Structure formats: structure tokens, C-alpha cells
Design a protein with these regions (language model features):
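Second-shell loop/turn segments in exported
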Residues: 6-14, 56, 73-87, 165-176
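VWA/integrin I-like adhesion module and closely mimicked acidic/polar interface patches used
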Residues: 118-179
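A short amphipathic beta-strand at an alpha->beta junction
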Residues: 35-39, 153-156, 190-191
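Von Willebrand factor
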Residues: 1-114
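Sec-exported extracytoplasmic/periplasmic mature domains
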Residues: 24-31, 75, 95-105, 119, ...
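Extracytoplasmic/secreted envelope proteins and their assembly/folding machinery
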Residues: 19-23, 90-97, 139-142, 179, ...
Length: 191
């Protein structure tokens, strides 16, 4: 059994594609009657989600209901857009971990993050000091501040770290830093 959260940083009017592998976790959660949720990386974004449970008695009725749950969930996730330019990926990642903990039923917990990792706001707002610091040092400092959620027992998958959309370009040095930083943050508290 699996429960999951999808975190996306898609902004208003931006088109993006959610990786198929990312959608396998919410599909499994919905089919198993577990929690599936999503949120955007806006500052103070509210998680959306629920535990999906069928109400029909027949196998055919349950399958139809699950298909409807899947369609509704995927439409919501693919349509989710950040409402402000205040993207804070770390805050959203922490919120997702806390949301899964609040719905913990003993199943495997998975967070799928679809983001470049760039955050113009929050504790990881891109500054030259941050981008030049060691990922482990950043993780240790944030953990000592209590700025990281408990990721123990939570599997986190990142999609698109260091990749820009449209005509934006992220320099290789920054892309490499982002690709190492976020997994290190998760590992710092047991993920």
C-alpha cells in the first residue's frame, strides 16, 4: 500500500508535462483506497487531497468509481498552477511531508516533486552564498534551525531539478547544485 503527495511548481499560464512515473504513485494510492494529495510550491500553499474509498458493492461499480477518482485527481494535479510568483520549493516539500504524516496509516509514503528547484522566496532563495555552499552544510544548518520536516520513512522522487522551462536557461553549475541539494535535505532528516 502507498500514500502520496505530488508537489508541482507550475506557474500560471505555463504548460508542463507530469512524468508518467510520477503518476504511478497516486494511481496506486487511489486504487488501494489510500491518501493521495497534491500542492503547488506557492508560499503558504494549501494541500489538496483525500483518502479514496469506493462506496459501490459490485466489482464493476468499484472499478468505475476508481476510474472516476483517477480522472478527477489527474485533472486536478495537471491543472494545478502556482497563483503567485512566490515559489518556495522547500516549504512545499515540508508541507507535503507533514500532510503525509497527518494521514499516515502505515502504508508506504511517497512524495513526487516536479520542480526546477529554483526558489525566489523562502530559506533557499537563490543567493550566491547559498549556491556556493556545500549541500551537507546547508542541510545541517536547516536541520539545526528546525526548518526541515521529518522525512524518515518517506520516499521522495524529484523530477526536473535544475531544468528550466520555456526559454529560461539554468547554468550547469546551478543545475548541479540543485540536483544535489534537495536530495541531501531530505536525507538530513531520515528520508
Amino acid at each position: 500500500p502507498v500514500s502520496c503527495m505530488v508537489v508541482t511548481s507550475a506557474s500560471q499560464n505555463s504548460a508542463f508535462r507530469i512524468p508518467t512515473t510520477c503518476l504511478a504513485y497516486p494511481k496506486a494510492a487511489i486504487e488501494q483506497g489510500n491518501y493521495a494529495g497534491y500542492l503547488t510550491c506557492d508560499t503558504n500553499s494549501t494541500p489538496h487531497g483525500k483518502t479514496f474509498a469506493t462506496t459501490k458493492n459490485s466489482q464493476a461499480g468499484q472499478e468505475k468509481e476508481i476510474d472516476s477518482f483517477l480522472a478527477d485527481y489527474f485533472t486536478s494535479v495537471c491543472g494545478a498552477r502556482a497563483q503567485t510568483g512566490e515559489i518556495d520549493t522547500l516549504s512545499a516539500l515540508n508541507n507535503a511531508a507533514n500532510e503525509l504524516r497527518a494521514h499516515d496509516n502505515g502504508s508506504k509514503m511517497v512524495i513526487s516533486v516536479i520542480s526546477s528547484g529554483l526558489s525566489p522566496t523562502g530559506l533557499l532563495a537563490g543567493s550566491s552564498n547559498l549556491l556556493n555552499a556545500d549541500a551537507n552544510d546547508i542541510a545541517n544548518q536547516l536541520a539545526s534551525m528546525g526548518a526541515l520536516a521529518n522525512f524518515s520513512g518517506i520516499e521522495v522522487h524529484f523530477y526536473g531539478l535544475g531544468q528550466a522551462s520555456g526559454e529560461q536557461v539554468i547554468p550547469n553549475s546551478i543545475a548541479t547544485k540543485l540536483q544535489s541539494l534537495y536530495p541531501t535535505l531530505v536525507e538530513a532528516t531520515g528520508g
